[in-house]
Amino acid sequence: KIKTMKYLSFNIDNINAGKILFDFYEKTGDGRYKVAMDTLRKQLAEQPRTSEGGFWHKLIYPHQMWLDGIFMASPYLAQYGNVFKDTTVNADIMNQIKLIARKTYDPKTGLFYHGWDESKTQNWANKETGCSPNFWSRSIGWYAAAVVDVLDYMPAQFEGRDSIMTIINTLAEGIVKYQEPETGVWWQVTDQNNRKGNYLESSASSLFVYFLCKAVNKGYIPVEYKAAAERGFNGLIKQFIKEEPDGSYTITNCCAVAGLGGKGNRDGSFAYYIGCLLYTSDA
């Protein structure tokens, strides 16, 4: 049991923070950490799913998969399976990654929409595809980071690996396509460039740089992407890192939060995403 966890909310955001428990358990052997890890694993075993097995984002967001959710759950599940020799998780992880790619990928832009509603009933959902209407950079960054992170815990060869490599290379191509040429970083709404109100956003840019660097280092994408990764890293420092008078540093232009549906007018529109609060040193 995790004392403050609202288990029956089936909030997939609960899972990601559990990754730190593996280190605590390894270093201390304290069984309480194992109980907490098992609790998170149990949530995923019981998580409501779409008809094709995709995790709902939360119980209050029925029939919906968001790109965010792949990052929140899949790396944890992959590490759990690796540490505790639970190979049953591998096929599930591959299904999550490939399913949301099929449902949210837009071949016209080379990008992935933020969310998908299987029921196609949400106010933000396209009535034909179920997709949300725009490309939120941080959600794409979360998805990209998740895909390269899960491979750390998967067997060297597994069924579906070629499909995952295709997704990684598709992500890299789309991300670099929309890299802002002067600064090397990325916009809050990925494909809207200099549209009035759009802004360069630090958390998404950081995730994109992380993904590109790791994918190049692991050999998942061609080494030619290294130049884009370096431009992005240098851009992060120049655009977003601010030294304070006391010698500390802050990261600027962090979108506080964005989602779909629920409370407020979270309709996935361009106006919604650019209207999200900006924080410093928070994402």
Task: Say what each PLM segment does.
Residues 1-7, 35-54, 90-123, 165-183, ...:
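Long, well-ordered core segments of solenoidal/helical folds
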Residues 15-24, 55-69, 110-136, 183-204, ...:
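Carbohydrate-binding/catalytic loop surfaces
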Residues 20, 29-72:
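Extracytoplasmic mature domains of secreted/periplasmic and thylakoid-lumen proteins
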Residues 80-88, 150-161, 218-222:
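Inter-helical turn/loop segments and adjacent helix faces that build the functional surface
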Residues 144, 150-190:
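Oxyanion-binding "anion nests"
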Residues 201-218:
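Internal helical hairpin/lid segments
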Residues 279-283:
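Conserved small/polar residues in nucleotide/adenosyl-binding loops
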